[in-house]
Regions:
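Short, well-structured N-terminal submotif of metal-dependent ribonuclease cores
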Residues: 1-34, 44-57, 136
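Active-site-proximal, substrate-binding regions of enzyme catalytic domains
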Residues: 50-72
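Active-site neighborhoods of divalent-metal-dependent phosphate/nucleic-acid chemistry enzymes
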Residues: 64-111
């Protein structure tokens, strides 16, 4: 596995046929995973039980589970403290920081369309991020 999916990246992927084509091989090879904070965030968009079940099935079929590390809280506190020194600690949500901690722990790159991850990565040297629109880079 190479990438950990963020909801912003998934929304773009699901809505853009060009991105679906560009990332098809990575999805097919199970190179893109998801973690429960991201799935929970995306499942919030389900309009009813049927759609909730469809989304849950999509995650199970396409995006392997990546476990959130037990030490995520320490990583988040450290990074948030560094971000506060430059006044950027409010740029990333709690879910974004959980996803970032999970990616950093597993050595995965966050696949996103969210400038917040670039901000977090400037303060977390063990975090890498990649915008889903940057295909082939």
């Amino acid at each position: 596995m190479i990438y950990l999916l963020d909801t912003s990246g998934l929304v773009r992927l699901l809505s853009d046929p060009g991105l679906q084509e560009a990332w098809y091989d990575a999805v097919d090879a199970e190179a893109i995973g998801s973690c429960y904070p991201q799935r929970t965030e995306f499942l919030y968009t389900a309009r009813d039980g049927s759609e909730f079940d469809e989304i849950t099935e999509m995650f199970g079929d396409l995006y392997p589970d990546v476990s959130v590390p037990k030490n995520a809280g320490r990583w988040i506190a450290s990074v948030q403290h560094l971000m506060a020194q430059t006044g950027e600690h409010r740029s990333a949500s709690a879910v974004d920081l959980m996803i970032a901690a999970t990616a950093a722990h597993h050595g995965l790159t966050i696949l996103h369309d969210d400038a917040d991850y670039r901000t977090v990565a400037r303060h977390a040297l063990d975090l890498s991020e990649h915008n889903i629109h940057d295909v082939g880079r």
